[in-house]
């Protein structure tokens, strides 16, 4: 069973980190039920060092998920 309250809280924590570190640049932040993960796509493309730095700021484990149509993508497995 999906715990939507936990998902929403985690999304809020992710949004807070992104806004604090990069400013408002979230294109998409949503839960993918098939992957059982939160997916994040930014509106900008980050360099490798920036990706590593941002990943270290998140309160939950994050993985680089490649390049999307709008920017860098990350995934957070629940």
Walk through the language-model features, giving the residues of each.
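An N-terminal amphipathic alpha-helical segment
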Residues: 1-36
């Amino acid at each position: 069973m999906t715990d939507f309250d936990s998902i929403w809280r985690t999304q809020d924590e992710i949004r807070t980190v992104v806004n604090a570190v990069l400013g408002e640049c979230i294109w998409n932040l949503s839960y993918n039920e098939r992957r059982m993960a939160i997916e994040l796509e930014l509106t900008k493309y980050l360099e490798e060092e920036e990706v590593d730095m941002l990943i270290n700021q998140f309160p939950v484990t994050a993985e680089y998920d490649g390049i999307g149509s709008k920017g860098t993508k990350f995934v957070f497995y629940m």
